[in-house]
């Protein structure tokens, strides 16, 4: 798993190229690209459709369609770790279970 180090002066050396350390949000890395985020997640979950920015998602969020279930997720690495580690995504809406996702 990617570190969730929160030190304000730490440099997130483990972040993918182009990502930023963002202690203000309490995240070790901010993913700056939708496709970078998908690559980050690829070792856990097979994305079944192309990644796109969803106009209906909150600003900065990512639209992903997994097993034909569209949902919005925050761009923070910590949230993707939660998705990959726990197998589900915590949202304001009812939790979207990913039990049927094909694992690579």
Curated annotation (Swiss-Prot):
It comes from the Eukaryota. Residues 1-24 are annotated as: Disordered. Partially overlaps YBR175W. This is Putative uncharacterized protein YBR174C. It comes from Saccharomyces cerevisiae (strain ATCC 204508 / S288c).
């Amino acid at each position: 798993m990617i570190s969730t180090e929160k030190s304000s002066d730490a440099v997130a050396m483990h972040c993918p190229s182009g990502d930023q350390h963002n202690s203000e949000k309490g995240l070790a890395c901010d993913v700056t690209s939708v496709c970078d985020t998908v690559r980050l997640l690829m070792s856990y979950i097979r994305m079944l459709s192309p990644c796109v920015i969803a106009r209906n998602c909150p600003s900065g969020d990512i639209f992903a369609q997994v097993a034909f279930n569209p949902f919005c997720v925050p761009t923070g690495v910590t949230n993707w770790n939660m998705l990959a580690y726990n197998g589900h995504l915590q949202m304001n809406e009812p939790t979207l279970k990913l039990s049927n996702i094909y694992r690579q």
